[in-house]
Amino acid sequence: MKNYKVAIIGATGLVGRTFLKVLKERNFPVEKLYLYASANSAGKKIEFNGTEYTVMELKDENIANDIDIALFSAGGGVSLEYAPKFKAKGAVVIDNSSAWRMDKNIPLVVPEANPEALKNHPGIIANPNCSTIQVMPVLKVLQEKYGLKRVIYSTYQAVAGSGQKGLNDLEANLKGESSKGYPHQIAFNTLPHIDVFLDNGYTKEEEKMINETRKILNLPDLKVTAT
């Protein structure tokens, strides 16, 4: 079995640490590990498989030349700037942000639904929104067996998805205090408002699900709505 030199961009964040956890749980054959983060996190120590690694600042001169796989979870702006640079050094980039998802030249992949999209990939591979990922294996089977005419999504997202400010609002509401980040009380409530509202009436997060579903299933005219 081949061993791989792996880089994690955004290594000190929640998703970056989850990358490390999954690599360890699955005994992924990591020969060498590179950890990258912002200047504020550079120098931190992270243990992996009994070895302590020092987090490097993400900048051009620190990009190693021998990386096989680069796992990105550092936001869309970072991915747009640095994914091509890692690719140019020979790495295959797997990006967790929304930066490349709708690029017509970049495959958007859920392995259980469209693994064939990985053939002849250009060196950057996108994975979709978490809400889209979990439903794709089911929709793929339904499409193959019966065909899809329309998809209606209703998703209920955790407050944690809006970050620390959202959690602060939840805690404040539970104490009888007003929200500062949310436009209305979030405790014991559901708000049809995730990310910004667009001109078409959908929110940005809802539109992601619509567009990603069509691309992954290769059904550009599929009727999809999401709330």
Which role does the model predict for each range below?
Residues 189-227:
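Oxyanion-binding "anion nests"
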Residues 1-186, 218-223:
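N-terminal Rossmann-like NAD(P) cofactor-binding subdomain of oxidoreductases
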